[in-house]
Amino acid sequence: MTTHASSYQLFPLGDSAITVDYGNRIDEALNREVLARYLQFRHQQFPGFIEAVPAYSSLTIYYDPVFIRKLQPEGQTAFEYIRTRITEMLSLAIPVEEKPSRLVRIPVCYDPSLSTDIENLAALKQLSTDELILLHTERIYRVYMMGFLPGFAYMGTVDERISAPRKIKPQPTRAGSVGIAGQQTGIYPLASPGGWQIIGMTPVQLFNRNRKDPTLLQAGDRVQFYSIDKYEFAHY
C-alpha cells in the first residue's frame, strides 16, 4: 500500500530541527505512516540531514544549520530552506507496511511483592488482581515510539478498564518494572525515577549496550505479555 502525507504542520525545534506534526493522538494507522516517513528520510537523505526521530504522531528531522547556510539562497532562513525540502519529500507517495510486524512475547511477574501498585490499582478499578492481570496480558500491544530512557518502549493501548493516571510525584523505579500510564504500558529498562503505576516486573533485559542491537524493542514491534510466578522470575 502507498500513501500520500496526511494533514500535518511543520514547526521549528530550535535552530537545527523541524517537527512534522500530524496531531496529538494515538492512532495505529497514523503511526505506521510516521514510521514509513522515518524510513523515507533515512533512505533519501537531503544534504545536511543528520537524523530523523519518530514519535506517536510526529517526526522530527535534525539537520546541520552550518552546512545548510551554505546552500540556502540569500534572503531565506535555514528553516525556510529545510521546510521546502521536507515539503517536497512529504508530497511523494511512499509504501506503508501492512503485513504484521515482529511479535515479541515478554514474561511478567505480577506478584505484589514485585509490583508496588497492582493491588491499589485493582482496588481503584474495582477489579481483582487476577482480572487486572488478565486484561493486561490478553492484548497485543504496538510499540509506538522509543524514548525517555534507552530502550524504553511506549506501547498501547491498554484496556480502558485498567488505564490509570501517572503518579503525582515520581518514585524510584527498578529496572524491569512494568507500568501503566493513561492508555500506555511500558517497561523501565533502567532504574529511574518514574510516575507510572507499577503492576509487575520482567526478568528480560530491555537494554544492553554490549549487544549488536542494544534495545530489545523497536518502534513498530508488537508485544504480548504473559504471566509468570516468582519462582519462574527468579530462575529465568
Regions found by a protein language model. Give the residues of each.
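Glycine-rich active-site loops that engage anionic ligands at enzyme catalytic sites
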Residues: T2-Y236
